[in-house]
Amino acid sequence: MKQYLELVAHVIKHGTLQANRTGVNTISFPGAMLRYDLQEGFPAITTRRMAFKSAIGEMVGFLRGVSNAAEFRELGCKVWDQNANENAQWLNNPFRKGEDDLGEIYGVQWRKWPAYKRIDTGNVAAIELALGQGYRQIAESEEDGQSFVVLYKAIDQIRQCIDTIINDPGSRRILFHGWNCAQLDEMALPPCHLLYQLHPNPQTREISLTLYIRSNDLGLGTPFNLTEGAALLSLIGRLTGYTPRWFTYFIGDAHVYENHLDMLNEQMTREPYPMPKLVISDRVPEFAKTGVYQPEWLELIEPSDFSLEGYQHHPAMTAPMAV
C-alpha cells in the first residue's frame, strides 16, 4: 500500500489549508489517482489495522438499499451514527424522518433510483413504450395549455449493470452512481464515492472498476472506500463469471484533516506489509463454475461472507470523524 502513503505525503506537502463545512480545516489537493491490480492482492491498508468488517458491513448495507443507521449497526457498521444523529444541518432538515434516519443515501439511489417521465398525453407511442418499460402513471396535469401525464418507476442500477455484463459485456455504459440532484437535500450526506464504472473483458474474462470520488478524507475515508470498491468488484466478478483485475480510484478533492496529521505522520514511518487476499465464502455461487446467473445474491450476501487471508498489519490507530 505504498501508493496510499505516497498520496498522503503528496497532499500534506503540496496541498493548501482550507476551511470547510465541518469546522475542521483540511490540507487539500485537487485531483489524485490510485490504481491496484487485484491479482496482486487486496488493497487493505497495513500501516494500521483496517476496520474491515465495518467497511464490508457498509457495502452490504448499500447493496440492500439501507437508509437507516440502526440497520447499518446491525451489519457491524457504526460510521453512520454521527451523520444520522449529530449533524446539525440534517437534524434541522424537514426530510429527516427521525432518529437514525439517513434519507435517500447511496444504496437507495443504487437500487431504487426514482425515475420520472413527463409525456404529452397526445404522444401515445411514448406512453405505451414507458409503460412497457415498467413505468406506471401517477399523475395527469396541464401546463400552458398542454396536457401531460407523469409516470414513475424505481430503477435498480446495480442489477442493470450486472445484467449488462452478462448480456452485453462489450458495452461501455456499465455504470451506476448516487448523485441524484433532485434528492441531494433529502440526504444526511451527499455521496462522496459517487460514480462506479465496470469494465468486463470477454477475451480475458477479467473485470475492472473505475471509481470516481468527489471528496475523500485520506485518513479515514480512503481506506474504507478502497476496501468497499475492491470487495464489490470481486463480488460482481464472482456473480458474472469474471476475475477481478484493475481497480482505478480517482479523487476530486483529496484532503487530510488537521486532526488526522498525527495519525498519518506516524503511519508514514511504518513499513507496509504485503497485500492480503480477499476470500469470499463458498456459499456464494460462482458463475464461472456453475454457469447459473444468480443476481439475487446482491441481497443475500452477508458481511460474514468476506474475510482477509494473510492480513498483517501494524497496531490500530484512531482519529475523529468530521461531521
UniProtKB/Swiss-Prot annotation:
DUMP binds at residues 21, 172-173, 214-217, 225, 255-257. Coiled coil: none annotated. One of its GO terms (molecular function) is thymidylate synthase activity. The active site is at 192 (nucleophile). One of its GO terms (cellular component) is cytosol. (6R)-5,10-methylene-5,6,7,8-tetrahydrofolate binds at residues 217, 322. It is found in: Cytoplasm. Its EC number is 2.1.1.45. Pfam families: Thymidylat_synt. Gene3D superfamilies: Thymidylate synthase/dCMP hydroxymethylase domain. Homodimer. Belongs to the thymidylate synthase family. Bacterial-type ThyA subfamily. This is Thymidylate synthase. It comes from Pseudomonas syringae pv. tomato (strain ATCC BAA-871 / DC3000).
